[in-house]
């Protein structure tokens, strides 16, 4: 992947051969010679440690090598030197959102860069980079569950480039997450009409078929996605009813003692998938891919309900198909069942999503 960088002339006073040496760094990167890219960029930085182009290439190579902490530190150095460099800003945001995307704080930092870059792109009239910032913003907002806001960004992106498959795909995912299933179905089918080998479109059409109860179509779609990108879509781990129930029972037994006493009045159930009414009973709707849900009043609120008696007993539901699809191995599935039980028990205890995220139970 090439960094989001255009050829430009350094604004710093630098040796006359800087541009030629930067071209050599770029060539090394384009040929996949990442260590050579680092070596050449570091040699330039030894002579001019605030050369933004060299910092950009260095950060890009580090990101490709998976050395993300170093990449982000280097992007930070570069942005201090060139705070209004849109391509640099976009590359840093892409690293935060697309590469460190399982870290909510990183995604939010990336979204802040997207917002700034979007405004600067509008001001300068750079519609190409404006599209990229809007697309990345939509991806990041989907990742943190802000799917309605993601739709706004993605619709704006598609105004600039209506046929962009990546933006259309991300928009369709937002529709799915917002439980607008008929619109999502149409959107994914239209994407496949233009790009028949788009694996995520097949995967989501499989999820939609599964929700409709069309097991044959779901298997066909999941199979197509797996055939296209097997490492991205491994077959789900299936425990079977008895083994799954045992894993849930073990997870409850592992709860801290001071929590177990509250579980006596909680119904714990396992269902294949969340029902539409359960998802759309919240505003915004819950994700169709949720692993579990807590229903009822938290312990902290029960004392105010009829003198402590809650006429609507609390319940926790785990969704087996979503959990099995989430995990890559049997061990990972059993671990995730435990985490999900703890997550929903956290809601029982009155913790919100931010509290749970801070405790690593998101």
Predicted regions and their residues:
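TPR alpha-solenoid repeat register
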Residues: 54, 88, 126-127, 133, ...
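Canonical positions in the second alpha-helix
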Residues: 43-44, 77-78, 116-117, 123, ...
